[in-house]
Amino acid sequence: SVYVKASTVDIRSIIEPLIGHDLTVTQSKHSTKMSFTKSNDEYVMRELMRLIGNGTHHSTMRMNPELFGITADEKKALLKGIADVTGYIRKSNIAFGQEGAHRVYIEIPGNWYMVIDIANMLKAIDVPVQTIDFGHPNFRDGKLVKYNEGKPNFWKKEHQVKIFANEFLAVGFNIQHKQE
């Protein structure tokens, strides 16, 4: 709860000046939602839509090819923003139980293209991706173990881009508890 509130403050302090508008924060038992309303005619909205390929749902957003031409520092800032929202670093993210092999997971639900865009953006700044786990039945339940246990939708999970934490330091997080 403390982390969620701290994260919300961190994210708001970054986004609100960019959009020139206060975010509305709504909390429930299991989620925190931040939203804002602006006219699609406003410049910031036109630019935002252009940069996400006019995607109107998380599953239809793409990185505009122009983003791959921005400076390395701008790419890091973009990736840091993505990681703040959908990146995780937990004790359980250790690779194969190896000491010092912690990983950052960037989780992308239902968008095959954004996974590749993020991996290519990381590659462009020389941050290697350790692995990508796609939310696909061959990756998540290839031997049909969970399926045969009566869980036919077990495989329907987010895609995960996994990066070793020491490599991800070049990008980092704005959110303090994730960075620590």
Residue ranges of each PLM-predicted region?
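Internal intein/HINT superfamily modules and their associated LAGLIDADG
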Residues: S1-E180
